[in-house]
Curated annotation (Swiss-Prot):
Residues 4-63 form the AFP-like domain. It comes from the Eukaryota. The lineage of its organism: Eukaryota, Metazoa, Chordata, Craniata, Vertebrata. Pfam families: SAF. This is Ice-structuring protein LP. It comes from Lycodes polaris. Signal peptide: none annotated. Belongs to the type-III AFP family.
Amino acid sequence: NKASVVANQLIPINTALTLVMMRAEVVTPAGIPAEDIPRLVGLQVNRAVLIGTTLMPDMVKGYAPQ
């Protein structure tokens, strides 16, 4: 199973992501792949993301799966 990106803290709506906000974890259902963490830095979330929430592609403005 591949790791997905999970919120390490509460991320308020419209916040630009930084490395400390995210961690890699194997979760079900899978979200954004952990290897995309470098691409997520600087992108904004379009909703509040609670700690422990798996980041899904539709939660991050400008993110497109490769």
